[in-house]
Amino acid sequence: MCSSDLEDLAALAESRPLQVRFIEMMPIGYGAAMPCISGPELLARFRRRWPELAPLPGAACAALGDGPAVYYTVPGWKGDIGFIAAVHGKFCASCNRVRLTSQGFLRPCLASEAGCDLKALLRSGASDEELLTAIRTTIWEKPQEHHFELKQDIPATRGMYRIGG
């Protein structure tokens, strides 16, 4: 998408009851080489166009899915704009997500290669208790936080579309 189209996309929330979300490119796999606009830069840009842009209260954000997005709106708008700033606005401590890949692998984090092969467990006849233990172990493996800002080479053995990102 062209950078010049971002305001037009955000403006859809002005006249329509939509939540338009902007996700900061995660530096994983091919995403590490792609140019991007940071969440804070995009928010500043939108505030220049819409000076009344203000964050929604926490309860209103939770009603929109209790995910990592931080939502903003302008008085009189029918919708909201959401920002998921994975690099510049770490939300790891409040992340309530795990990812189940299309290959049956449960990951505790998009930035992690850790996890468990639920498909293999299911096919081997694992008991409900064994499955529950594997899922709990994976959840406890969720990292405290990522370190994308260090610009380390974070390998992604699969495309983001395959790991639920």
Where are these regions (language model features)?
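Structural preference for beta-strand elements that scaffold enzyme active sites
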Residues: 19-21
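Short, small-residue-biased leader/transition segments that mark boundaries at the very start
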Residues: 2-3
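Auxiliary Fe-S-binding modules of radical SAM enzymes
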Residues: 14-15, 25-165
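Aromatic/hydrophobic pocket-lining residues that form π-stacking "cages" and hydrophobic walls in ligand
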Residues: 9
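Aromatic/hydrophobic pocket-lining residues that form the small-molecule binding cavity
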Residues: 6
